Amino acid sequence: AATRLAVREAKRLTGKDAPLHIVGFSNGGALAMKYSLDTLDNAELAKPQRVILISPMIGITSFARFSGLAGWPAFLPAFSKAAWLNIMPEFNPFKYNSFPTNAARQSFLLTKALQKQIVADARNQKLNSLPPVLTFQSVMDSTVSTRAIVTALYNRLPDNGSEIVLFDLNHAVRFNSLLR
């Protein structure tokens, strides 16, 4: 609902004829992709002309399905910190540092629903109406599954100009001389 509200407000401010490019990072990438897929079934939603994803949460580790269990001890006051996978100072305005167990569970459920929708839309040939998707993904990402982005999304996309940019560390460079 938040994504639909944001797009509706953006279109109100820019005018209905302005192009719509949706950009999403991590969980926002999953929401951007979900919205784009939802437009294939709902003509009232503004259709994007381009989808740009940065480390999109198309899939995460399967252990996230059990993250809700990790928070159960938090019902006892002495174990209240169990509701969090990690608690850190919040200094980054673009990313939460602390992560509640329920957020991990909700992220897992979102990725499963998104993957199911992608499969159904591919089977029904609806992905042919999807705008081009441009994705930037680090192969070193420990949260988002690069494999899921390729297998669950890109292997199902039509030949519409969609691209994935994978990047990694330069393992050949030696930094020892810089650190002396």
What do the PLM-derived regions correspond to, one by one?
Residues 59-118, 179-180:
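The alpha/beta-hydrolase serine catalytic core
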Residues 34-38:
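Active-site signature of alpha/beta-hydrolase-fold catalytic machinery across serine-
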Residues 51-63, 169:
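Active-site nucleophile loop of the alpha/beta-hydrolase fold
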Residues 2-14:
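Alpha/beta-hydrolase active-site loop
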